[in-house]
A protein has these predicted regions:
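Aromatic sugar-binding surface patches on proteins
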Residues: 175-202
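Surface-exposed, glycine-biased beta-strand/turn segments
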Residues: 4-64, 86-87, 95-100, 110-169, ...
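Short coil/turn segments at the loop-to-beta-strand junctions that recur within blades
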Residues: 75-76, 121
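Histidine-centered divalent metal-coordination motifs
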Residues: 72, 98-104
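Short beta-strand edge segments in extracellular beta-sheet folds
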Residues: 230-233
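Short nucleic-acid-contacting surface segments enriched for D/E, G, S/T with interspersed K/R
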Residues: 78-86
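Beta-strand/loop nucleic-acid-binding surfaces
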Residues: 68-75
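Glycine- and acidic-residue-rich phosphate-binding/metal-coordinating active-site segment common to enzymes
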Residues: 106-108
Length: 233
């Protein structure tokens, strides 16, 4: 997988644009493979060669087997297949004021969170943990987070009695059979978003009695918030 350090050389494709849907979020029954940005104009995130362009889609090939994908974009007149483009070159205009931006690693066959390469969200707030629920029969722990701050969400960890037992990172999405999985095979869409307004972690087994459960939420720049809870089984 391409390291975050090398991806950081890429530019945000819409300076001043607003992220309205984050990577890995639940959308239309599957994970969002990129980010949705509210903006009028779209610019090349890095120099490369136009691999494909159509009525509302542009794909640009870069070094290191990386593609940047721009959906819901009407291409500029100077954009055509195989043409070389420079970093920051205007690619086109959005349709309806919103476009989808994705980064795909051809070698690793997975989508990479575009926010690994931009400081666009440095000032975003971390989400707050509103509560926990536990299904002892299924070993499912649900974490309820506030919507505010989800754009900057990088990792959620579950710690039971001081030991990390599960970790969910918003780094990559890949295809597994007919579905998409987030970060690790354990996190399929139907499991993670099975309860409305919650992230559900499978395979969490709590001991009978009182359990100390911590939820550690981290953003892309290492800021953390910790929620301390107790669950009695």
């Amino acid at each position: 997988m391409m390291a975050a350090a090398s991806l950081s050389a890429y530019d945000f494709p819409a300076p001043g644009g607003k992220i309205i849907s984050s990577f890995g979020s639940g959308s239309k029954g599957e994970f969002n493979t990129g980010i949705d940005i509210q903006a009028d104009n779209v610019f090349a995130s890095e120099a490369g060669e136009v691999l494909y362009y159509g009525p509302d889609f542009i794909a640009v090939a870069h070094e290191d087997s990386i593609l940047t994908l721009y959906s819901h974009v009407t291409a500029s007149e100077d954009i055509s297949k195989d043409v070389h483009i420079s970093r920051g070159q205007r690619l086109g205009r959005t349709k309806g004021g919103v476009f989808h931006f994705a980064v795909y690693d051809l070698e690793m066959e997975r989508y990479i969170n575009p926010l690994l390469m931009t400081d666009n969200i440095k000032k975003s707030e971390l989400p707050k943990v509103k509560g926990l629920s536990y299904d002892s029969a299924g070993g499912m722990l649900s974490v309820y987070l506030s919507d505010k701050g989800l754009q900057g969400l990088y990792m959620v960890q579950i710690s039971v009695d001081g030991q990390v037992v599960s970790s969910l990172g918003f780094r990559t999405v890949r295809r597994k059979g007919d579905t998409l999985v987030l970060d690790r095979e354990a996190f399929e869409y139907g499991t993670l978003y099975g309860r409305e307004g919650a992230f559900t972690f499978p395979g969490i087994h709590l001991n009978p009695g009182d359990n100390s459960v911590d939820v550690i939420v981290t953003d892309f720049y290492g800021k953390k918030v910790v929620f301390h809870g107790r669950i009695t089984v």
